[in-house]
Every structure is written in structure tokens, then in C-alpha cells.
Amino acid sequence: MAAPERASEAETGPAEADGPEGLALPPPPPPPPGPGPAPPSLAELPGELLELIACCGPLNASDVVRLACTCRRLREACQPRGKVWREQLRLRWPSLMKYYNQVDSVNWLEEYKQRHKAGLEARRIVASFSKRFFSDHVPCDGFTDIETLECPSHFFEDELMSILNMEGRKGLTWKYYAKKILYFMRQQNILKKLKVYLQRPADEQSFLEGAVLIDQYCNPLSDICLESVQAQVDDIVAKVRKFLKSKNSRHPSVTQKAGEVLIVSQVELQRQVLDAMNYVLYEQLKYKGNEVDYYNSLNSYIRQVLIHRTGIPISLSVLYLTIARQLGVRLEPVNFPSHFLLRWCQGTEGSTNIFDYAYIDAFGKGKQLTVKECEYLIGHHVTEEFYGVATAKEVLQRMVGNLLNIGKRESTDQSYQLLRDSLDLYLAMYPDNVQHLMLQARLYFHLGIWPEKVLDILQHIQALDPSQHGAVGYLVQHTLEHIERRKEEAGPDVKLHSEEKHKDVCYSVGLIMKHKRYGYNCVIYGWDPACMMGNEWIRNMNVHSLPHGSQQPFYNVLVEDGSCRYAAQENLEYNMEPREIPHPDIGRYFAEFAGTHYLANAELEFRYPEDLRLTLADVQKTPKHMHMLAQILPTSPNPKLQYQKRLGLKGKWPKQWTTEREREESHQHTPLLHLLALSEQVHKQTKMATTVGWPQVYDREHIPEFSGK
């Protein structure tokens, strides 16, 4: 029998070699696998996945545009109405998304373009305001460009808010005018809403909504909306309902369904609601009338009343009335003299008999008063007409009247804004009220703003009441003179310290000073070589009693309390611990707070071109300046650059660098120069040395010696 044939190597592969001691060697590794199927390209992925990739990546708008240009599939993924451009809008301007619903079909690419254009336009307008209105207050006709905007107003507002949210100490002039523009835009929008509100039928005018409109108009930069205020009121209603349930679980106000309009008809059930309200408001939540600071304007703003839980009779009454009506008890406002009240009918509904009502004092913890007790409250007898129901318009009129009185009582520049705002509101409700029209004309005349508007108001007054021709004629004459003087004014007055007539001026614009007598902190924004005020002012301020009288330099200063003052040089001194001055007009004159001083904006620097150099020389002598250097220089790889940045030198240096020998000799004179030398040694040791320059040698008499370590 023949032996089987051995398989060939071609069939079985090479024969395995025997290893030592007859052990077989391991088989060779298998050959690498051949190329598999290629992964799908980006364009082959599903559209939803492409959208997700484009939304999740760190892509900006330019990247998305380039991506859409690569192929048809990616262009479809980046379509204008798709998620990609919606995400781009959200990433760039997240605050805008509150204006859209998830189900809206929006051209997001077009929205992005419109918002971008609105931002450019907003910055152009803001940048133009400083040059146009530096010398005068911004008149209402200065906002003409804004009234004719082609872009959506909320896009424009969003850009203004982004300017206001810039780093705190920088961009002060931009913030100043952005705030004014935003103030104007929002007030115009609120005035439109108020006029719509006043045209509604009386039974559709919510007292709470009217109070919110007043709050919004006087505080247009605050985040106040009817929905948030109503939500806070609803929380109080829920607490009252919970307490009421513990007393009477079957009360109709407890079983009331959401959105249901309830009217509780039985007097006893109404009393239970009012008792529960009094407990929750005054005992549990601690609401109370503000007797300590009664004339604070915050007491009139409904949002502040809800925050601080205190107010005046009318604001607390609006809150009390709103809560009661939501719980089914109909209370009515009473325009009682000197003390606003509510009335609660305990007889036939709609009764004209004043004795059929109990009168509720929301300021007095909800106490229920009789007619006689109401008279005791104000100290004198009143006729029946004062117990009648007030309309929503009359309630708003009284609220605005309170703000008007507060504006008249105070005399700072900030309160003039309150007076102007409350006058605007009053005249929006009663446009032909001669008394308030005359007050508005006098206010504008006193402030020296918008003389053309003053003439329009005076002409309107003359048409309404010819008997006012005397006062009208006087104001017309002086207003026309003011307009003529403004036309004759040449360019801005440039003042130089180097001129001989200014040799006695010791201080410069931007320095933070302290008043020797009154102790207030302030910043200089202008100066005169002698007092430029009239004789009456000089006499009233007793300037002649000063040792140097009126023939010494005087300075225009912005004070930390919000006022603007004119101070004699001998009454001012350097503030050795300079701080920011929280004045509302700081951005009108200054662009930045540099830590030890303010940097003038372009308009102010043009008028005082030499002051920056002098200000920088002066601030180097303050302890705060040396402390600032002690913090920066020893740890900085480039002390010179950091020194320049913190001082606001903009690439300049106050004096040429000294030689090495002068540098060494100067160490014994000033602790600051010793500090700088030490800084350079540290950086040389750490191989971070730079060419460090040395500021001018300080006057020894102005440099307090360091003590301790």
C-alpha cells in the first residue's frame, strides 16, 4: 500500500521548524487585514447630525458662513431658519432669546444681521453724543436719530445694555450717554403704554398696572415688569388663602379655581378674608407704613414696597386692594385728604350713604375706621365728597402728585430728574394743566436746557390762559436772550496752566480732592483763575470772608453726594486716599477711573490740554500710588508697562530715564525709588529683567517715610 503524498508547501505553508529540545516554534503572526470600507464623509451624515455638529462646535458666525459655502449638504444644514443660526444668535446675544418662542418660525440669519447692524448704529450714535452735547444737557430733540431707527428697538436696547455692562471703571463716557439714550427710549415706550391704559374703560384699568407704569417711568433702567410684580402679589394671595383655609376650609376664596373671577357677597365671609389679610400682611410678612422716612420716593414705587415691605398710605392701599379683589372682596379707593384710604361696603352695594362703609387704613395695619375716626385721623372735619370713590386715573394723579412734592422738597441735581419725570407723567394725564405746564417751563428755564421747548410750552400756556401773559412774557424774553447768547458763543474755551494769568492755579482736572471745612470727597472737572460767579452768589456764599476772597482760583467739582459745587482753592486739599466719586455726571467729563485719579474724556481734555500731565505728576506723590506700585512692580515682568497702564499714561512716561549712577544716588531720597530698584534686582535674578525706567525724583516734603517692614 503506497504511502500518502506529503502536501506541498504551497498548500500548507512552510513546515514548522523544530525548536530546541524538539519544541515547535509559534506560528508567525497573521498578515494585516486589508483596507475596509471608508468612513462616511461629513456631507454623507444625516442632516440632524450635521446641525448638531455645527451647533456644538466652537464656531462663530464667520465659520458658519464658510461652512455653508463648502457644499450643498452643509448649506442645507446651515439654512437661515435652522438651529445653527438660532444657536449663533443665542451664543452672541443670549439676552435676546426672551423675545422668541420655541415654536416661532424665524429667519435666524436675518435676525443675526439685524442685531449686528443695530449694534453698529447704536455705537455710532453713542459716540456722537459726547461731542454734540458736552456743553449742554441732551435735549429731547437730540434723540431724533433714535426715533427714526429702522432696526427693532429691542436690538438697539440690547446693544446699549452691553455698553452699560462694560468693565466698571472704563468707558465712563460711553456708559453715560448710553444710559441717557436707554432712559429716553424706555420712557417713550412707557408713555405710549400709559396713554393706552388711560383710554380703556374704567372697569378695565387695573390699579396695580397703573402703579407699575409709574414705577417703570421713574425707574426706566430697572428691571420692572407687571408680570414679576403680579407674581409677588400672587404669592401673598396664596399665603392668605392658606391661612384662611386653616380658619374656614369651606370658604369660597379657598376653593376658588385658578383664573376664576370670584365675588364674595356675604359680609361675614368678606370679614374673614380681611382678617386673614391683616394677619398675613402685617403680622406674618411684617408690612408697615414708613413713618421714619415718609418722604422717600421709594415709598411710592410698588416694586420697592414689595421688596422693603413698607410704603405710604396710597402705595400700601393699592397692594391691599389688589389682594382683596383677587380673593373676592371688592374694596374701593377713597381720595381722602392727607391720608389715602379704602372703603368696604357693609350695607347695600353701591350705597351713597357714607355711613354704610367701613374705611380701611392700609398704612395703619388694616385698621377699620368709622367716618368720625377718619376725621380724627387728619384732625379736621371734611365734607361727604371726600369719602367718594376715586377712579384709577385719580389714584395715579395722586401718586404722581406725591412724587412731584418730593421732587420740589429736595434740591440736588438728581431730584430734578424726579421732578422732570413726575411732571411728564402728570402732563401725560392732564396735558392742559396750566399750573404744571408753567412749572415745567420754569424748571427747564432754571436748568438752562432745551430753550426751544420752553418757548413751545409758554406759547401753549398763553393760548390756554391769557391772564398768564405777565409771567409768560418774562420767561419768553429771557429764553430768547439765552438762545441768542448760545448762537454767539465761539468754540470751547481752552485753558492752559502755562499762561501767566493762570500761574496761581495749583490743581488740575481729574484730581480727587477733599474739602477742608465740609470733608466731602470730590473730583475737579474745571477751574477758573478767579471766581467767575455773580456778585449775588459771592455775597450769598460769603466768599469775601475767605482769606484770599474771590481773587483766588475756583474749581468746578463733582461731589460724592451727587451735587456739583464751585470751591475756592484754599478750601481744597489733596485726598491722600483717593476713591471713586459716585456722581451721576462723572461720565460726562471723564472716560476712566485710573485708581488714583480720573482720566478726562476727549472733550474735557481739549479744554484743559495741559492738565493730564500735571495730574499724573501730582498723583505720584500719594501713599495710595506708592502702595499700588508696591503691589504691581515686584511681581511684574515689565514694571514700566504696568506702571504706565495703571496711571493711564497711554505709552508716555513722565520723565526721561536717569543714568545708572543717578539711579543709585536717588535711592536714599525716596522709598519709592528704592522699591523700584529692588524690583529690578528681583527680575534680574529670575532672568526676567527689563529696562526699567525711573520716574522723576519726588519732592521729599510730599513723601511720607515708610515705617516698619
Describe each PLM feature range.
Residues 475-509, 518, 531, 643-646:
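Mixed-charge, Lys/Arg-rich low-complexity intrinsically disordered regions
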Residues 393-410, 432-443, 471-482:
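Amphipathic alpha-helical repeat scaffolds of TPR domains
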Residues 551-554, 558-658, 671, 675-708:
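Intrinsically disordered, low-complexity, charged/polar segments
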Residues 2-3, 9-11, 16-159, 167:
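Skp1-binding F-box subdomain of Cullin-RING ligase substrate receptors
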Residues 375-378, 410-420:
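Helix-turn-helix repeat elements of alpha-solenoid scaffolds
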